[in-house]
């Protein structure tokens, strides 16, 4: 579709077909449109509201231009959309670490901070993890640990073409929505936290179209009813679940799983060093019970979608055990050691 025809369609608030959106995103990432047109397209799409058919087309375009990596069909990604401005510590990151200690393969796709003070890449780096390993080095690490962090800029180089436009626009765009879906390992199992409950159905419908096997899209509430882009130990958590093509809906509270209810202030994070310290304390057992509960709650959901647990309750038991017997801490220490060793080896080979 030509640039002007596309703009006219979006100005009229008309939805694009999946193929039209795929062509649109491809043109955006390959220099087919001017910067001014790209800014207009992104803003108009955001105003109109992206539909699942459009998002699946955008997903195909983005994955076509991604650097792929083959890991494990059972690997799980835990991530959030951001945007809740709650200032909590990196719950989805420590949840991935705990779940991995419980035997779950993890392929966490992440980036530096966008809407918070500390993104998953930031906190892992502060913990001593080299985040920009090559795909080959990452595959080697994963083969030994069943843990991989996939640094988004490394696997989606075509996004550089629009980075300056997104920065100047200063608004959320379709690329923010795409982020949690665009794992370069093409994972089929995910826990996605969303700050806006109105997009839960969008994600579920798109995950169905992209071949996901088991996913939970979660939206939490604080004690005051404010949004959280993760499961909540402060209030209710709404869940849209996709499992082998079947969609179901649940609303749960922490007490159902034997967890206490906490205040958002109990989960506050800080900068990368602050959040790294919180994660260390969670792993060594010296963190607050609120921090531990929030972490194992999220980790339990990862265990469930991985197939390691048959329900969230069972996942919670596995994650508690992973923390209490020290498996999560020992396992992550080994990951850091091997990450350092592999990074040094590949750096030496390049030099």
From Swiss-Prot:
The EC number(s) this enzyme carries: 2.4.2.18
Keywords tagged on the record: Amino-acid biosynthesis, Aromatic amino acid biosynthesis, Glycosyltransferase, Magnesium, Metal-binding, Transferase, Tryptophan biosynthesis
Biochemical pathway: Amino-acid biosynthesis; L-tryptophan biosynthesis; L-tryptophan from chorismate: step 2/5
Gene Ontology process terms (BP): L-tryptophan biosynthetic process
Binding site for 5-phospho-alpha-D-ribose 1-diphosphate: 80, 83-84, 88, 90-93, 108-116, 120
Cofactor remark from the record: Binds 2 magnesium ions per monomer.
Signal peptide: none
InterPro entries: Anthranilate_Pribosyl_Tfrase, Glycosyl_Trfase_fam3, Glycosyl_Trfase_fam3_N_dom, Glycosyl_Trfase_fam3_N_dom_sf, Nuc_phospho_transferase
Binding site for anthranilate 2: 166
Catalytic activity from the UniProt record: N-(5-phospho-beta-D-ribosyl)anthranilate + diphosphate = 5-phospho-alpha-D-ribose 1-diphosphate + anthranilate
Family named by the database record: Belongs to the anthranilate phosphoribosyltransferase family.
Chain's role: Catalyzes the transfer of the phosphoribosyl group of 5-phosphorylribose-1-pyrophosphate (PRPP) to anthranilate to yield N-(5'-phosphoribosyl)-anthranilate (PRA).
Quaternary structure annotation from Swiss-Prot or TrEMBL: Homodimer.
Protein name listed in UniProt: Anthranilate phosphoribosyltransferase
